[in-house]
Design a protein with these regions (language model features):
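Catalytic phosphate/metal-binding cores of nucleic-acid and nucleotide-processing enzymes, i.e., regions
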Residues: 109, 114, 123-127, 164
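A structural signal for well-ordered alpha-helical segments within the folded catalytic domains
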Residues: 104, 108, 112, 145, ...
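Proteolytic processing junctions in secreted/extracellular precursors
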Residues: 3-15, 30
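Pan-zinc metallopeptidase signature
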Residues: 153-280
Length: 280
């Protein structure tokens, strides 16, 4: 049985990955489509391009205004405006369209920010004690804080599910589905037992965000060779993927909360197992 530390009492206590409602998930996909369509448009200054209503994890009504800002130094950030407010209707998010990279990366970045937006610790449950140890300029107080643990782990697990779904839809025989299941088990054992990752598992984690993949038809066709023919992954570059570095950073600064991630991962693996075994 997993023993949770006291600090987790300040976090929504779901033991599985947090999922947006089907309605909010659809809205997020649509928002991703609209923002992706703007990636090549010349935007000289910060402009408001969208709004989205959603629900927080405690059921409160929330809304975010979405801005594109080509001068913003980071990829994206969701915050409350004014910062002193705790009204979930007052979220503002800005993104730098020059940093979008891939469409998968854009979606998962938005997903990460909405994990913050749905977290009542930003709004209806905000308190000084919870935030006093949070400092984005200090690794231990940023990566080691429960608010980033929640956002990063849910972002990764959502991406993992989506990547296995995508690959499962492209395979056409039982043998290839068994290969996917073996990689899924390998990824679980890597995080739980330190088992080395196979080349295919590395490729799967790398494709979660299409890290470094150029936005061209040829680049996507070449990248999908290992998707359609998993055995070719043995010839792929085995550099450490971004999400592997990210989750290992979370582990480094959240050793007490790490068992919670493993429980979330185990449940997610079961979810993916069911998807693959159904062949859909």
């Amino acid at each position: 049985m997993i023993k949770f530390i006291n600090i987790l009492s300040n976090v929504i206590s779901e033991q599985k990955r947090y999922k947006l409602s089907p309605e909010d998930y659809t809205k997020l996909l649509e928002l991703t489509d609209r923002l992706w369509a703007l990636r090549s448009r010349k935007i000289p200054r910060k402009i408001e391009v969208d709004q989205m209503e959603f629900k927080t994890a405690d059921g409160s009504d929330a809304k975010v205004r979405v801005f594109l800002n080509p001068r913003y130094k980071n990829y994206a950030q969701m915050d409350l405006k004014p910062r002193t407010t705790r009204n979930p209707q007052k979220f503002v998010m800005q993104l730098n369209p020059k940093l979008f990279g891939s469409k998968k990366n854009l979606f998962l970045t938005l997903y990460h920010e909405f994990m913050h937006g749905t977290d009542p610790n930003f709004t209806t449950r905000a308190n000084e004690k919870y935030w006093k140890d949070y400092d984005p300029t200090v690794d231990e107080k940023y990566w080691g804080h429960p608010v980033e643990f929640r956002a990063v782990t849910n972002e990764f697990l959502e991406g993992l599910v989506n990547e296995f779904k995508r690959r499962n839809q492209r395979v056409n025989n039982v043998e290839k589905r068994q290969t996917l299941l073996m990689s899924l088990k390998n990824i679980l054992n890597y995080f739980a037992k330190g088992e080395p990752l196979t080349r295919l598992s590395l490729d799967i984690i790398n494709r979660i965000s299409d890290e470094g993949l150029k936005d061209t038809r040829i680049a996507n066709l070449l990248a999908d060779i290992s998707t359609d023919y998993p055995e070719t992954s043995e010839f792929m570059n085995n550099k450490e993927p971004y999400y592997l570095k990210l989750i290992n950073t979370i582990k480094k600064f959240n050793s007490d909360m790490w068992p919670r991630f493993l429980k979330m991962l185990y449940d997610t693996v079961e979810e993916i197992n069911n998807i693959i075994n159904k062949g859909t």
